[in-house]
Amino acid sequence: MRGAAVFGLAVTAGCAGTDRSAKPGPAASGGAAAGGPPAARALKPSAYRLQPMAGNGQQRAPRLRPRVRRKPILRMDGQDRAMVLTFDDGPDPRYTPGILHTLRRHDVRAMFFVCGEMAVDNKDLLREMADDGHLIGNHTWTHPLLPKISRSAMREEIERTCQVVEDAVGEPPAWFRAPYGAWNRNAFQLGAELGMEPLAWTVDTLDWTEPGARTIIRRVRAGAAPGVVVLSHDAGGDRSQSVDALRTYLPELLDSGYRITVPSAHGI
């Protein structure tokens, strides 16, 4: 996925798809911005989730819809040696808890692009992600090849997943990732229409091939650089190697001066 936009922009209204009359903005490529702060240990309710309203509290202001992009965001600007770890296809109760435990142990945040068919029966893991300050992204319901399905089917895949996430954590996703990294115009338009930015990756661990923890670690080491987005998986097969590899490469990255972070919740 060469030539994709640089990561880092406002986190905008997630899955604002109930207003289907609104039209997406003009096509554009992404600009650079800083990543978010390092993780804070669990605060309840978490900053990711909607805060409870007091009796006279003001309602949350609607967030702006993102513009339609022609390419997915590929990386962030790398300020302060920032990197992003992302995990796709979950949550899976066999592997996601181990990943969450390692992230919590090192007090860092990551992004989880969840599939609705996995999330619907594992909402407790979504809440755990949110409570720990991780960002939850939309990875469709059944992980289809988006260019091969109709626009209406694509909308249903994305909207259903948005709803599951919002039901679980009180706020819909603001980020979307196409399965297999296969994007088309409909995917970009619907993602923006539903309030999400498209995020790809820079470093693919290929952990889904089950190459062994040592190989996964070696690929992360080789690809580590300021601004990169690392792709791994926490479901979709035996992901024990991914869990084991994270225990080794995460502290190595931190010891090397990398700041493992997530996109800023503020605009550029």
Indicate where each model-derived feature is located.
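Active-site glycine-centered loops adjacent to acidic/histidine catalytic or metal-binding residues
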Residues: D88, H139, P179
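Structural preference for beta-strand elements that scaffold enzyme active sites
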Residues: V84, M111, L135-G137, W175, ...
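N-terminal pre-catalytic segment of deacetylase/amide-hydrolase enzymes
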Residues: R2-L85, D92-R105, T248-P251, S256-I268
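Short, surface-exposed connector motifs at secondary-structure boundaries
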Residues: R81-A82, H106-M111, A168-A174
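Acidic (Asp/Glu)-rich catalytic clusters
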Residues: I99-R105, A119-G137, A192, R219-G223
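Catalytic domains of cell-wall/extracellular-matrix polysaccharide-remodeling enzymes
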Residues: G98, V120, P144-R259, P263-I268
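Histidine-centered active-site/metal-ligand motif
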Residues: H134, H139, H143, H233
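N-terminal carbohydrate-binding/catalytic regions of secreted carbohydrate-active enzymes
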Residues: G90-T102, R109-E117, K123
